[in-house]
């Protein structure tokens, strides 16, 4: 099937919660509509025959910096380039909105995906945990 991608595409929180639980192995349920309305420049949805198979969120500072957040692809849809296309379309949209920098942080297992497949450059950055792990 042909994957359809849409910037600021429609989604239901329950379908995105299922995808998030599968991608990140977390049972958390969020109100994704409220989340993106309050913090996002936009997002990209990927659908295969109407089913949500991918999502990426682009949060921003309202000016020149944007961040890739929550790139997710359904397990049975992986290996088809969907994640790369999600990030590419998010990159184009952030650039079109006037952003000058697109940031991403990731677990080591995603290093090749973000650096080699998506074209990000490694940087020195810092991170401070503000809560105790669950």
Task: Describe the role of every protein-language-model region.
Residues 94-106:
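Conserved GNAT acetyl-CoA-binding A-motif
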Residues 103-112, 127-134:
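Conserved beta-strand-loop-alpha-helix junction that forms the acyl-donor binding cleft
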Residues 1-31, 45, 126, 134:
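Short amphipathic alpha-helix that is part of the acyltransferase structural core
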Residues 31-49, 53-72:
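A conserved beta-strand-loop-helix scaffold within acyl/acetyltransferase catalytic domains
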Residues 115-125:
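Conserved acetyl-CoA-binding loop of GNAT-fold acetyltransferases
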Residues 77, 81-89:
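Conserved acetyl-CoA pyrophosphate-binding loop and the N-cap/start of the following alpha-helix
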């Amino acid at each position: 099937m042909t994957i359809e991608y849409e910037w600021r595409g429609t989604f239901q929180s329950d379908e995105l919660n299922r995808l998030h639980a599968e991608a990140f192995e977390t049972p958390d349920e969020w109100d994704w509509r409220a989340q993106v309305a309050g913090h996002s420049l936009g997002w990209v949805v990927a659908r295969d025959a109407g089913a949500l198979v991918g999502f990426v969120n682009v949060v921003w500072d309202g000016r020149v910096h944007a961040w890739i957040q929550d790139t997710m692809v359904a397990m049975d849809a992986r290996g088809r380039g969907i994640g790369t296309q999600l990030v590419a379309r998010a990159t184009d949209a952030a650039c079109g909105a006037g952003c000058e920098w697109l940031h991403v942080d990731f677990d080591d297992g995603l290093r090749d995906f973000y650096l080699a497949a998506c074209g990000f450059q490694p940087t020195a950055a810092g991170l401070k945990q503000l809560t105790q792990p669950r």
